[in-house]
């Protein structure tokens, strides 16, 4: 199978219910009911507006260097992504390549199966019980990883 064929088989993400009512805060899409903290507001006001027109350093080197110094590691040991989906994508490519299925609950972050399908990583979902609890016995099987 060609890579392109594999991508075409990925089922597009479909957002959950998106009610359109006034004053509704949608926590499932990371909306926040609170205004920015005073320090954030002040930093935004003091920011040079020209900086907003430009992309940041593509490899986040200043941030990587600061994190490496803070944690006492080499910069090569620090990974910085451009959002949680980027970090998860890299984690799937890096850690879940044993050929064994990864396991995760059937009610979870909706992109786990998308990444698994895209990168041809076998997976198995484990049902939650009627009280939304995981059954540890479901995870006692050969696997490449368990995601909670």
Which functions belong to the PLM regions below?
Residues 1-54, 140-142:
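N-terminal "arm"/small-domain region of PLP-dependent enzymes with the aminotransferase-like
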Residues 56, 80, 104:
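Conserved SAM-binding loop
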Residues 61-101:
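Phosphate-binding glycine-rich loop
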Residues 94-115:
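Conserved PLP-anchoring active-site segment centered on the Schiff-base-forming lysine
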Residues 106, 125-130:
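Short beta->alpha connector loops at strand-helix junctions that form conserved
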Residues 119-123:
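A short helix-loop-beta submotif of the ANL/AMP-binding
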Residues 129-148:
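Active-site phosphate-binding strand-loop segment of PLP-dependent enzymes
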